[in-house]
Regions:
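C-terminal motif of bacterial Sec signal peptides marking the signal peptidase cleavage site
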Residues: 16-18
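GH16 jelly-roll
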Residues: 126, 137-393
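Short boundary segments that mark the start of a structured unit
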Residues: 21-144, 152-153
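Bacterial N-terminal signal peptides that target proteins for export
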Residues: 1-8
Length: 393
């Protein structure tokens, strides 16, 4: 045997000895295996998220994690968490626990995010580096501030002739309010998406306020209350103090229609929009008048009310939406700031319908030609809270 025949076996033995006889450990693939969705209650006060690696390892591997706000806020809706997830040899699954703050306050469904980062001994699986925790809300108590603008309960030379302070809990006072129900004709003429109900899920009096809730629970529902056939009036001052819902596709309104609508139709009866807001413009409200002999010749005249520097939106605190109405003139006011007037001179040659009796309507529409459809950013349930409505003459 010559020396050349020994060189390759010897080299193989040396290489095997240097590697310890084992294959190198493959990098671990870190990933989440679940999102988490649950109602906010004591039974679901902890959200657990599973983190997995593709296969057990012979040495320790780890990855960092941290929570981040979505629409849910750390310290208000959940407890912020961060740290390391360590996989001991042989382990393939670990759990991250995030504590949920349970309360009784009605609020929209909200979410937060848990993210993985800085893997040691492995890498992050594409598109599975984050998990979402969605906090569903089934509470009924409402938490809003009484902060904001207010108006007096009397004016010199005028008397309170009608109003509602919403002091009796439950359904709206049937001696003052009735309902429009259903989905109307062509979505109430605007391709709106909601079905109006008289359910306490959509309209209720609580803590001295009337609440109208816009919901999305297997279909859009809301409420539309009115005084038609119960109370109408001609001339005077109206004050309505309210907090408004906001969000894409949300459309709250405080408005009036001519009492002769059943005989002359719309828009010949006249329409006075004391306040309308389209939810994607949360710092702007509109005041508008509609008239004309028929739908083909309908006319309107409207303006945007002055935007306030504080609060940021009309959902943050109460504002008072008012009109001052006399023969041949109506003025619209926001927090006692006069911003628009209509007179017969604005009718474009058509009949002025605003010297006749009108009735009130208050509603929250969902979707429609003006605001557009809701999307994933729209907070549900949304609500309008009315503190009082008063008529002085």
């Amino acid at each position: 045997m010559n020396w050349k025949s020994l060189i390759f076996p010897v080299a193989s033995v040396l290489l095997f000895s240097a590697c310890g006889g084992e294959e190198p450990q493959a990098p671990a693939e870190f990933r989440f295996s679940n999102d988490r969705t649950a109602f906010e209650n004591e039974a679901n006060s902890t959200f657990s998220f599973d983190v997995r690696i593709d296969e057990a390892k012979t040495t320790e591997v780890q990855v960092q994690y941290a929570t981040a706000d979505g629409t849910a806020l750390a310290g208000e809706d959940y407890i912020a968490a961060s740290g390391s997830v360590v996989f001991a040899p042989g382990e393939t699954k670990k759990t991250i626990d995030v504590s949920i703050i349970v309360d009784e306050w009605l609020e929209p469904d909200e979410y937060f995010i848990v993210s993985l980062s800085a893997p040691e001994g492995g890498y992050l699986r594409d598109n599975i580096q984050e998990a979402v925790g969605t906090i569903r809300n089934d509470d009924t108590s409402i938490q809003i501030s009484d902060e904001g603008y207010t108006t007096p309960n009397n004016y010199p030379g005028m008397s309170l002739v009608w109003g509602d302070e919403f002091e009796v809990a439950g359904a709206p006072d049937p001696a003052k309010w009735t309902y429009d129900l259903g989905n109307g004709s062509w979505g109430w003429g605007n391709n709106e998406l909601q079905n109006y109900t008289s359910s306490p899920e959509n309209v209720t009096v609580q803590d001295g306020r009337l609440y109208i809730f816009a919901r999305n629970e297997g279909g859009y529902t809301s409420a539309r209350v009115k005084t038609q056939g119960i109370f109408d009036f001609q001339y005077g001052r109206v004050d309505i103090r309210a907090i408004l819902p906001i969000g894409q596709g949300i459309w709250p309104a405080l408005w009036m229609l001519g009492s002769d609508i059943t005989t002359v139709g719309w828009p010949a009866c006249g329409e006075i929009d004391i306040m309308e807001l389209v939810g994607h413009q949360p710092r702007l409200v509109h005041g508008t008048f509609h008239w004309g002999p028929n739908n083909d010749e309908r006319q309107y005249n409207g303006v945007i009310a002055p935007a306030l520097e504080f609060p940021e939106t009309f959902a943050d605190e109460f504002h008072v939406f008012s009109l001052e109405w006399q023969e041949d003139e109506i003025k619209l006011l926001l927090d006692d700031q006069h911003y628009h007037t209509i007179t017969p001179a604005n009718m474009n040659g058509y009949e002025y319908p605003f010297n006749d009796a009108f009735f009130f309507i208050m509603n929250v529409a969902i979707g429609g030609n003006w605001p557009g459809d809701p999307d994933d950013t729209t907070p549900f349930p949304g609500f309008m809270a009315v503190d009082y409505i008063r008529v002085f003459q």
